[in-house]
Amino acid sequence: MSTYVAACNIEAGKAGIVFQNSEQATMTAKNNTIKVTIGGSSTGIKIIATNSNAGNYMIKGNVIEAANGNGITVNFAKSATIVDNMIKLSGNTTSGISLTGCDSSTVSCNTVSGRYPAVSYQNRGIYGSMNQKCYISCNTTDSLYKGVHFSSSNIATKFRGNEMKKHYIGLYLDNTAVIDTQTHAGNRWTGTYNSTYGAWNENDSSIFNSSKTILIYC
C-alpha cells in the first residue's frame, strides 16, 4: 500500500511527517506546509528506512519551518528523492536537510535559509554522513553557520551546481570527511564568510580559496 501526504498544513511539536516502512510501498510527501517547534530532535519530515531497501521515497515541494531540530532527515534509505523543498531554520536548529547512511539518493533544487549572523546558532544547511553514490545538486543555502557539511565517508558522492551564500563557512569537510573527486562541478560561492573561508577541509585547507569567491571546481 502506498502512502501519499500532500497539500497539508501541519504544525507539530516533534515531527510533521514520519515515514518508516518495510520498503514494500511508495511513500510521498508533496506540497505540504509544515512547522515544527519543540526540542532539538524535532523534524519536519523524517524518513527511517529498513535494511531491505527498495528506494521508494519522494519528498518534493514542501515548505518547512523548523524552530528547533531539523527540516528533513533521511536515514538509511536507497534512491530517496528530496527535491524542490524550501526550508527555513528560524530557531536553534541542527540541519535543514540531513542525509545519513543513504545509497544512491538525490538532494536537488532545495533552498535552505536561516538567520545567521543575526543569531549565532551553529546550524547547517545540508549535512551528509556515511552515504554512497548520492547526488547533491543545484541547492541554495543562505544565512546559516555552515552551508554544507560533510562528515565520514561519502564515497562516490557528486556535489554539483550548488550555491552557498552568506555563512560562517560555505562548505565544510570535517577531519573524517570523504566525498570523492569532484570535476568541473559548477558550485558557486556568492556570499561573504565570517570565517574568511568559503570552503574548508580539515584534512587539507590548502586546496580551498578563502574569503568571498566564486569557484567553478570543487
Mark where each language-model region is.
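Glycine-rich beta-solenoid repeat tracts in large extracellular/virion proteins
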Residues: M1, A15-S22, G40-N51, N70-F76, ...
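Right-handed parallel beta-helix
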Residues: S2-A12, Q24-I38, A54-A67, K78-G91, ...
